[in-house]
Every structure is written in structure tokens, then in C-alpha cells.
Regions:
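Oxidative protein folding and maturation machinery
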Residues: 1-57, 65
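Short amphipathic alpha-helix with an adjacent loop that forms part of the alpha/beta core around
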Residues: 57-62, 140-143
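Conserved redox-active cysteine motifs that mediate thiol-disulfide chemistry
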Residues: 63-65, 71-89
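Loop/turn elements at helix/coil->beta-strand transitions in domains of secreted/extracellular proteins
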Residues: 63-67, 98-101, 124-125
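Hydrophobic beta-strand anchors of alpha/beta hydrolase catalytic cores
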Residues: 68-69, 103, 151
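Signature tryptophan residues that serve as conserved aromatic anchors
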Residues: 72-75, 115, 126
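Structural microenvironment flanking redox-active thiols in thiol-disulfide oxidoreductases
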Residues: 80-122, 134-140
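Thiol/disulfide oxidoreductase modules built on the thioredoxin-like
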Residues: 124, 131-179
Length: 182
């Protein structure tokens, strides 16, 4: 949704119209979306990986690196997930030894076994984390994730560089970021 346009429309409404529950929900969605705009610092998170270890944005594997975060779920649209995973596997193969970028999968699954099965089935070899809260999880709210798959590219200092790039746009942006860091 075009949150800027919605925000302007809400601002011109009279008081009683602004008191509606739907308007409150829209304002909350706008507020969350604004917190994850390009150029803002990404929210902190701490989630468990498949081994039960706590992973944060500042974990050792991600320190001083740009970070591509992919939000996904085993229950997501299989065609979109498959296409996204294929692109991500190509990116991972190309950059897995690069010291300027890392990848992290944040699953919005609610079932641990389905999450683990999807990681194996789809051969997602980069770090994967999940809190089993689905789209209602804290991390989904913090990053204003409303659908999967989604992605966010962070700079080495934690600023949001780009959101929801796909295909060639994503590959080009990563190449640009890695080249600038070298």
C-alpha cells in the first residue's frame, strides 16, 4: 500500500473519522513501515537458529558485513518461495566466501518440524532462524513484514539499504554494495 498517500488522507479527516479502529490500525501500520524505511537503522532482533543458538544482527558471522535478510515460511506461496530460494541460492553460492556480505533467513513458520524440513528440502545452507510466531511474531512486526517472501538489505552499520528487491534488481544491488565495500 502507498502509506504516504494513506497518511495524507487520514490527516485531512475530521476528528470523529480518525477515531475509528480501522484508522488506528492503519496509523500503526504506517508507523511500523516508517521505522523500516531505506536509510533508517534496522531494528534489533535475537532469534534461535536450527541448533538453538541465539543469533542477532551483530552476531560474529555478520559483524562488519552487509546483510541480506530473507523473510520466508514453509507455508508461503510455493511458486514465489521456489523462485526466491533459487535466486538466493545463486547469490549465496557467489558470495558465501565474501567478507563484505552475509545472508540470513528469518522464517515466519509456526511449526518447528515444517521449518526444519523446508530448510533441508530447499537446501537453504545459509544461517536460518525462527521464533515460530508466524506473521504475528515480534520480528515480523518490527520489520513490517506482511507477506513472504520479503527481503531487506542492510549496510555493515545496520542501516536499511533496500527492501523487497527481486531478480536482477537484487543481484545488481548486492554487486554494487559488495564492490563499494572492497
Amino acid at each position: 500500500p502507498d502509506f504516504n498517500k494513506i497518511k495524507k488522507l487520514i490527516e485531512v479527516m475530521t476528528g470523529i473519522l480518525q477515531d475509528k479502529l480501522y484508522i488506528e490500525q492503519l496509523n500503526e501500520a504506517i508507523s511500523l513501515s516508517e521505522k523500516t524505511e531505506t536509510g533508517k537503522y534496522a531494528p534489533f532482533f535475537s532469534l534461535s537458529n536450527i541448533k538453538g543458538e541465539k543469533i542477532t544482527r551483530s552476531s560474529e558471522d555478520f559483524k562488519k558485513k552487509n546483510l541480506l535478510i530473507n523473510f520466508w515460511a514453509s507455508w508461503g506461496d510455493s511458486i514465489s518461495n521456489h523462485q526466491s530460494n533459487t535466486e538466493l541460492k545463486e547469490i549465496y553460492q557467489k558470495y558465501k566466501k565474501n567478507k563484505h556480505i552475509a545472508m540470513l533467513g528469518i522464517s515466519l513458520d509456526i511449526d518447528k518440524q515444517e521449518w526444519q524440513d523446508a530448510i533441508k528440502r530447499d537446501t537453504l545452507n545459509w544461517e536460518q532462524v525462527c521464533d515460530f510466531g508466524g506473521l504475528n511474531s515480534e520480528v515480523a512486526k518490527q520489520y513490517a513484514i506482511k507477506q513472504v517472501p520479503s527481503n531487506i538489505l542492510l549496510s555493515a552499520d545496520g542501516k536499511i539499504l533496500a527492501k523487497n528487491l527481486k531478480g536482477e534488481q537484487l543481484k545488481k544491488k548486492i554487486e554494487e554494495v559488495v564492490t563499494a565495500a572492497e
